[in-house]
């Protein structure tokens, strides 16, 4: 398991077998359980290391947790509160980090914006699309542009 502080990305959490009893950073009681968690240079009961927002047990939701602004967070809540992926290449609006996106080369798009930029046809899974002059094109518009000489013959 890992803790990531997005500012430095340092892995900091491991599951360790119980040795000498340690005090829990969450409840301040001795840890008598067989296993304990170590995060942020402190020891925790498995039940005490929880997301500050949704209260989920961080040892159960994955192998990564995040810290920021003195909060310990699961991935979902960290991204909801602090994350962004950048701007959509089609509409230029901000894309929240937790939102599903489509990517074409270095461009990132909202799912609703991932469409042919000439005819606005949305793509389905498996549809062929072309990236030409940094524009997303359906096969029909791309081929028409090739026939009309709008594009050179090299597909990007």
Curated annotation (Swiss-Prot):
<dbReference type="Pfam" id="PF00412">
    <property type="entry name" value="LIM"/>
</dbReference>
<comment type="function">
    <text>May be involved in gene regulation within neural lineage cells potentially by direct DNA binding or by binding to other transcription factors.</text>
</comment>
<dbReference type="InterPro" id="IPR001781">
    <property type="entry name" value="Znf_LIM"/>
</dbReference>
<keyword id="KW-0862">Zinc</keyword>
<keyword id="KW-0479">Metal-binding</keyword>
<keyword id="KW-0539">Nucleus</keyword>
<keyword id="KW-0440">LIM domain</keyword>
<feature type="domain" description="LIM zinc-binding 2">
    <location>
        <begin position="86"/>
        <end position="148"/>
    </location>
</feature>
<dbReference type="GO" id="GO:0003713">
    <property type="term" value="F:transcription coactivator activity"/>
</dbReference>
<keyword id="KW-0677">Repeat</keyword>
<dbReference type="InterPro" id="IPR050945">
    <property type="entry name" value="LMO_RBTN_TF"/>
</dbReference>
<protein>
    <recommendedName>
        <fullName>Rhombotin-1</fullName>
    </recommendedName>
</protein>
<dbReference type="GO" id="GO:0045944">
    <property type="term" value="P:positive regulation of transcription by RNA polymerase II"/>
</dbReference>
<dbReference type="GO" id="GO:0046872">
    <property type="term" value="F:metal ion binding"/>
</dbReference>
<feature type="domain" description="LIM zinc-binding 1">
    <location>
        <begin position="22"/>
        <end position="84"/>
    </location>
</feature>
<dbReference type="GO" id="GO:0140297">
    <property type="term" value="F:DNA-binding transcription factor binding"/>
</dbReference>
<dbReference type="GO" id="GO:0005634">
    <property type="term" value="C:nucleus"/>
</dbReference>
């Amino acid at each position: 398991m890992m803790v990531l502080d997005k500012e430095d990305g340092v892995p900091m959490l491991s599951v360790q077998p119980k040795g000498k009893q340690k005090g829990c950073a969450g409840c301040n009681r001795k840890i008598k359980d067989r296993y304990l968690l170590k995060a942020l240079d402190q020891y925790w009961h498995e039940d005490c290391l929880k997301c500050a927002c949704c209260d989920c047990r961080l040892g159960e939701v994955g192998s990564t947790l995040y810290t920021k602004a003195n909060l310990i967070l699961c991935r979902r809540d960290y991204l909801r509160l602090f994350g962004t992926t950048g701007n959509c290449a089609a509409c230029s609006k901000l894309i929240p980090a937790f939102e599903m996106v489509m990517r074409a080369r270095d461009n990132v798009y909202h799912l609703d914006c991932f469409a042919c930029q000439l005819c606005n046809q949305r793509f389905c899974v498996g549809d062929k699309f072309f990236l030409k002059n940094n524009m997303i094109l359906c096969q029909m518009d791309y081929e028409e542009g090739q026939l009309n000489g709008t594009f050179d013959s090299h597909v990007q």
